């Protein structure tokens, strides 16, 4: 079944539930923490998903989004959902690779560097990841990729040697390890704190998408963005499994249908947002373009090291994902 067909069926499911007046036992409100700003496309898709569920259940289940880390900081969201502090939320799961190496499958440098390859990798990993999350009291609803990750600096960089000693914003194990290999100093900084970190000199560089740089107006502190297309990490919307199991079938169907639509819309927006945000970085004075051949070769060598390390940490489960990806 094609993605467009799946989306159509999902929309019909949601529409049918609205027409039938899908009902839950009692009206509920679920708060949905999100780490990124309200203007970020992930947050916009999340808000539309929330509205879809609210409408699809006839208001019996209202989901209220809280973007920008306003309810829980990014690093706290997964635990908040697991423990039932909230019933739903969005999180970048690669930030939890220290819990289980599989969470970092989408941040293996230079494995999947395009949207098409990212989709193939997600197809290979979705089953094992869903099972892993279920074991942590989490039910996966949908996942949306970021645009490809590039390198931001406050200066021109032509080789890894020039990165030595630079303070580098990290957001997961992969970014911290990349910094270490390049001789940079990793500093853990959540998305909501990026602008302040660069303005105050806490960080001088990062690897992220054009989307994050645009949302945080990093041109106020940084000067260069290198398109290295290292990986396309994903944000995941998850529900507390006990809360999910407590919903009636009709409400679950609405949420599943809205999730399919959200993932489809998120994929499309991520693709469209890529060129737009890179153009905006350039319009605001940043130097934007591919990294030089020498720097690219050095970074890919780091990628080979990090791939081997990830496979060692993830074991047979990780190898199965890579094998399934390569088979496609």
Residue ranges and their predicted role:
Residues 1-13:
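Bacterial N-terminal signal peptides that target proteins for export
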Residues 27-118, 125-129, 133-328:
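N-terminal secretory/targeting leader peptides
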């Amino acid at each position: 079944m094609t993605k467009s067909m799946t989306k159509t069926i999902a929309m019909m499911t949601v529409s049918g539930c609205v027409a039938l007046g899908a009902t839950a036992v009692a009206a509920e409100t679920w708060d949905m923490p999100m780490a990124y700003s309200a203007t970020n496309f992930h947050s916009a898709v999340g808000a539309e998903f929330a509205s879809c569920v609210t409408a699809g259940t006839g208001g019996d289940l209202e989901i209220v989004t809280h973007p920008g880390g306003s309810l829980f900081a990014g690093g706290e969201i997964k635990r908040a959902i697991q423990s039932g502090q909230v019933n739903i939320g969005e999180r970048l799961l690669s930030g939890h690779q220290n819990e289980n190496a599989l969470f970092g499958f989408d941040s293996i440098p230079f494995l999947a560097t395009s949207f098409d390859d990212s989709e193939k990798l997600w197809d290979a990993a979705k089953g094992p990841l869903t099972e892993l999350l279920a074991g942590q009291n989490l039910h996966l609803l949908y996942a949306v990729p970021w645009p490809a990750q590039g390198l931001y600096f406050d200066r021109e960089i032509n080789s890894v040697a020039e990165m030595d000693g630079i303070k580098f914003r990290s957001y997961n194990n992969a970014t911290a390890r990349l910094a270490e290999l390049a001789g940079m100093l990793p500093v853990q900084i959540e998305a909501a704190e990026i602008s302040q970190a660069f303005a105050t000199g806490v960080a001088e560089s990062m690897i992220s998408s054009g989307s994050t740089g645009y949302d945080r107006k990093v041109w106020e502190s940084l000067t260069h963005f290198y398109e290295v297309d290292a990986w396309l990490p994903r944000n995941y919307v998850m529900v507390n499994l006990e809360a999910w199991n407590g919903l009636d079938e009709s409400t679950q169907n609405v949420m599943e249908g809205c999730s399919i639509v959200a993932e489809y819309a998120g994929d499309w927006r991520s693709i469209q947002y890529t060129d737009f945000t890179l153009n905006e970085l350039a319009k605001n004075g940043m130097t934007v373009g591919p990294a030089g051949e020498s720097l690219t070769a050095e970074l890919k060598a780091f990628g080979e090291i990090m791939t081997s390390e990830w496979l060692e940490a993830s074991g047979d489960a990780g190898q199965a994902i890579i094998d399934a990806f390569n088979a496609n």
